[in-house]
């Protein structure tokens, strides 16, 4: 299921934006209207989280770097929501659950949430650091088009407000 971004002149990219991400971007509006002065800076906070996520993704396409940025984004978003009503945390969690179920090959919840297993190479009776090798799922290219779409959707949403 896809959402349309009707105010955006980058319509083709916005049409590819998953609804879960659109809801994530609309979360600040819903939360800000819920409580008195507890979420005054939620737009600024989420914008800063998204900018940091984009900056982190731009540092390199290695899965470890991408996942570190992704995990930092979630920690940042949680800090932004910490001063908001409890309903905001429930919405955030439901968005994360929906995103985890999305059957996209570049789903960061799946790529970054996969456990890293350690297997031992059989090299003799001794076990040391050289005989242990971490394995993880095959590296996938960084989902730059999805991040670009997220940034464009945010610009679409914030554009009429400015």
From Swiss-Prot:
The keyword Transcription is annotated on this UniProt entry: no
Cellular component terms (Gene Ontology): axon; extracellular space; membrane; plasma membrane; side of membrane
Domain of life the protein comes from: Eukaryota
Covalent lipid adducts (GPI-anchor amidated alanine), residues: 136
Keyword Manganese belongs to the record: no
Localization in the cell: Cell membrane
One GO BP: neuron projection extension
Paired cysteines (S-S): none
Residue ranges annotated as propeptide in the record: 137-162
Pfam families, per database record: NRN1
Membrane topology: Lipid-anchor; GPI-anchor
Family the UniProt entry places it in: Belongs to the neuritin family.
Protein name: Neuritin-like protein
Organism: Mus musculus (Mouse)
Lineage: Eukaryota, Metazoa, Chordata, Craniata, Vertebrata
